[in-house]
Structures are given as C-alpha cells and as structure tokens.
C-alpha cells in the first residue's frame, strides 16, 4: 500500500448529526436476516484483523486487512445487502477511528443487539464522507450510534480478480488432511501443485499428499480420476493417496502449476478462523497473476473468503517429493536418537553385557555373601 492521505474523522451523537440534501446522498443498508448473514461471515475476523480498510464499489463491499500476518480480503456482494446504491468511482475508507471504535464494531457479538447498519454517503470524489449509523434494540427500546469517516484522498490497494484460474473443491476430510500436513512443520513453505501427469498435490519438506481429480469441468486437463492411466501414474509416485474413493472436483484451467505459501502456520491459522462450521472449502489459484494468489472459500453461505499471496519461485513438486522422503527419514532417526525409549536408557549407560557363565558366577558370589 502506498501514499495514503486521509482527512479528519468525526463522531456525532443523534443530536448533532449533520443534515444534507437527501438528493445528494445515497445509502447502503444491512438489516434483518441479511445483517445476520454478514455478521456471521465477519465475526471470526473482526476481533483480530489489523489495519482494516473498507472499499465500496458497484460490486459491493470489500474489507481488506491483515490476519495472522497475512493479507485477507473479505468481499460481500451487493446482492447480500438489504439495500445497495452506489454512485461514482470506488471509495476507500480507513475502518479505524481516533478512539477505540471502528466501522467493524457493529459486526461484533456483544450484549447490545444490532438490528440495522446503514452507510450514508455524501459529497463528490475525492472528498466524499461516510456516515455509519448503527441501530441497537434492547429491552423494548432502541438507540443508535454514529461514526463519520472521510474518504482516503490517495490510496493504492490490491483487489483480486473474481474468478481463479484453477479451483479445487475439497470436502471436510480432504481439507483436514492438508491442514494436518501443514501442522507437521513450523514456518515452512506449503506447496500446492497440479501435475502434468494428473493429480492435485499438497505438501511440505516432511510430507506430500495427493488427490485424484475429477477434471471433467476443466479446460486442457487430459486426465480423469476414473482413467486407469491417471491412477497408475499417481500410484507410481510412491506417495499415499488421500480419500482414494472420492475425487476432488476441479474446474478452470488444467494447465500444470506449482505455487508455495511462505508460512504453514499462517495458512493453518487463517483457514481455522474462517472454516468454522464449513463442510469443506474451495481452493482457488490465481496462477497468471503477479504475484500469484490462493483464494480459500469455505463451503458455508456468506462465509468470508481469504486471499493469500503465493510464490512461484519455489521447489518443484518432484523435488519436494524427493526431499520429503529423505527429510522424513532423517527426522524419524533424530527423534529416536535424542528421545530413546525408557527401556534403552539404562542399557546405553552400561558397558557390554558379560557372558552368561560370568553372570551366574557373580550371582552365586552375591548369594554366598
């Protein structure tokens, strides 16, 4: 992000709320079931997102921030709002205020029950301002609070394109297998690959797992999970195959790729935060972007979508398979060396055992004494 300049920000109560010509203003409203859906999607991240920005455009609302050290984008489509009207070019607002309040506080779960969130916009770019009015209901009465934010005059943000180049739909068990692999090492690269011979792979320097692919919806993917040739090639790799009977549904480009996330911990933490209650997730790969990105979209209606930056300058999946086989063996050997079984600890301290006849003589001597 480069060169952010922003105006001041103000907070008003109901008695000092500024008035303007209604014809020069427009608004976006979340209420009822649509508010509950959006709140459920955001509740897992609103308490931990750092430096959040909120972007409004014709497509909807986008929340951008940092979660667990990784950039995360949470898009909410315009159809997900109770009322959505937008005028002019895209506007960017800093969610934080001078106090502890933020524009995302309305989506936190607390004792005050929010019934409606209204964003009212006035002005002309680049001097538009946003008025957020949050209406609460408690014990038969209602009250509201208001925050006014001014548009960032100069800001540069990254908005991912809508459709990934390749998407893999994983069920809950398949996603858990990848998370298990990521948990075996700390702060190492997690590599994803679509092989030219067929099959979707995920792994680290310690372990690699593979999945059969149902590529009937893919373009330029010559293999299918039901073909004997593809199965033979995957089995020949010598790696264990996850969910053997259930193929991963894939769509998009079938062109081979190999991308890496720099930190297994970040991937695991982010996915754990957004996958609550999900029956699985879609992993979408933006292979033609610079830098490439990974999109994680849980199989829950209204759930947030995380976008993580990847690196294409990484170890190939073939090299990773070789390294994981050797590294895994070395790791197991070191564990047995540094943490021997209790039954072996005493034997390592003693010297070589005496011949049987010497042991019998020593035992007789002890008894005579």
UniProtKB/Swiss-Prot annotation:
Organism: Gallid herpesvirus 2 (strain Chicken/Md5/ATCC VR-987)
Gene3D superfamilies from the UniProt entry: 3.70.10.10
Protein name, UniProt field: DNA polymerase processivity factor
Organism domain of life: Viruses
Pfam family, any one: Herpes_UL42
Protein's gene: MDV055
GO MF annotations in UniProt: DNA binding
Function: Plays an essential role in viral DNA replication by acting as the polymerase accessory subunit. Associates with the viral polymerase to increase its processivity and forms high-affinity direct interactions with DNA. Facilitates the origin-binding protein UL9 loading onto DNA thus increasing its ability to assemble into a functional complex capable of unwinding duplex DNA.
GO cellular component: host cell nucleus
